[in-house]
């Protein structure tokens, strides 16, 4: 998704990102 919270529960940057393993990486 873009920003918000990952399925894993950690916070993500407001930019578009993808969750991998247990962390968010900017796409």
Swiss-Prot record:
Q: What does this gene product do?
A: Probable neurotoxin that inhibits ion channels.
* Residues modified to 4-hydroxyproline: 13
Compartments it resides in: Secreted
| Tissue specificity | Expressed by the venom duct.
The UniProt entry's GO CC annotations, sorted and at most eight, read: extracellular region
What name has this protein been given in UniProt? Conotoxin Bt9.2
Give the organism, scientific name: Conus betulinus
> What family does this belong to?
Belongs to the conotoxin P superfamily.
